[in-house]
Amino acid sequence: MPNWCENDLTVEGPTEVIEEFLKFAAGESPFDFDRFIPYPEEFRRLDEAAEAWGKEHAGRSDYDWRLQPKDGFNSGGYDWCVANWGTKWPASRVELEGPVTGDDEKTLEVVFHFDTAWSPPKPVIEKAAKLYPALRFELRYFECGCCFNGLF
């Protein structure tokens, strides 16, 4: 079980660009990492196979995974997720606040509140900023288990 990193991502910019961004970002959650940096299909298939195997063998007393040889096999794409998203899993408990109209009535601001495993998803925010250069992204994060926080 990870330490959870709390994230607040503020996105601000022209109304039409924010509306386009919100449509693009929405997938399995309002801010789906997979939309910005897609999780490889090969890992998705392995995840499904591992889940099916686990369900089929649940409760077996003659199998102890801890006794199996350590071969470096990674059925869940853990290393890929950490390298490409900056965290073990996609965002969880994602909530969208807004949009709120700016003072000039030509801009909008939205805030995504979400949790990630162990660390903030900096690579995902960097990719979003490259795809939407007209928007301003600000990520505030706090991980209370190891006592670190930051602004990105």
Task: Please report, for each region that a protein language model flagged, where it lies by residue.
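Long, contiguous binding/interaction regions
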Residues: M1-F152
